[in-house]
Amino acid sequence: MSVKIRKGDLVQVITGSKTGGKKGKQGRVLAVSGDRVWVEGVNLTTRHRKRVTNDKGTSSGGLEKRESPMHISNVALVDPETGAPTKVGFLVKTSGDKTVRVRFAKKSGKELT
């Protein structure tokens, strides 16, 4: 399967009941693992961490908010020109003897880096 969404991309939540009603929210991709994606500021869950004191006498623990994974089909890449969700296509470019696959936004045709 081709990797259409990568770490650092700006994506928008397009659907999904497990996303906590965050349809339409945009954020940067923190990580991608298989068919799961972590989006910054979206699908936050609260983790309860046990309070632990380290050697210096400071303690850490309590409630911690962090992003949870969601299915990659629930997000779409944001077009850099229009700011709307778009599909991703691939172009094969040849320069000399090298061939490179480049992602592009299907709505505007602009190349994605």
Swiss-Prot record:
Any Pfam family matching the protein: ribosomal_L24
Keyword set includes RNA-binding: yes
Keyword entries, A-Z: Ribonucleoprotein, Ribosomal protein, RNA-binding, rRNA-binding
Recorded name of the encoding gene: rplX
Organism of origin: Tropheryma whipplei (strain Twist) (Whipple's bacillus)
Record function comment: One of two assembly initiator proteins, it binds directly to the 5'-end of the 23S rRNA, where it nucleates assembly of the 50S subunit.
Quaternary structure and partners: Part of the 50S ribosomal subunit.
One Gene Ontology biological process: translation
Protein name: Large ribosomal subunit protein uL24
Ribonucleoprotein found in the keyword field: yes
Record-level Gene Ontology MF annotations: rRNA binding; structural constituent of ribosome
Family per similarity comment: Belongs to the universal ribosomal protein uL24 family.
Region ranges (Disordered): 48-70
One GO term describing the cellular component: ribonucleoprotein complex
Higher taxonomy: Bacteria, Bacillati, Actinomycetota, Actinomycetes, Micrococcales
